[in-house]
Amino acid sequence: MLSPKRTRFRKQHRGRMKGISYRGNRICFGRYALQALEPAWITSRQIEAGRRAMTRNARRGGKLWVRIFPDKPVTVRPAETRMGSGKGSPEYWVAVVKPGRILYEISGVPEKIARKAISIAASKMPIRTQFLISE
């Protein structure tokens, strides 16, 4: 599972996801890509599930790039705990994804295989996505 090695602060505010992604919205490394169409928090488990699905489907050959990284800690309070007494402890990590962000890139495989691999990875994501081909 992906997570930062160290951070300056253990806990973060939730924040809000306004607008579209201006960074990381172009294909940089591969030939085919998966692009987010909705804003969401994508957990490190979901990122890993998508990555595994793609590598398993592309089988031999092909290179895969994961373009998002979970750098936001999400805190959870223990069950049946009364309100107050501070913020909960960090439970898991999420990547804040805005519309337009490239999630995965792949190259070195035929388009048919890339489409299949990316569609399987897309089904693991909690948002609507689209398949892109670099010009």
UniProtKB/Swiss-Prot annotation:
One Pfam family, short name: Ribosomal_L16
Keyword Cytoplasm among record annotations: no
Signal peptide location: none
Coiled-coil segments on the chain, per record: none
GO biological process: mitochondrial translation
Keywords carried by this UniProt record: Chloroplast, Plastid, Ribonucleoprotein, Ribosomal protein
HAMAP family registered for this protein in UniProt: Ribosomal_uL16
Subunit and partners: Part of the 50S ribosomal subunit.
NCBIfam families from the UniProt entry: rplP_bact (TIGR01164)
Family: Belongs to the universal ribosomal protein uL16 family.
Name of the protein in its database record: Large ribosomal subunit protein uL16c
Lineage: Eukaryota, Viridiplantae, Streptophyta, Embryophyta, Tracheophyta
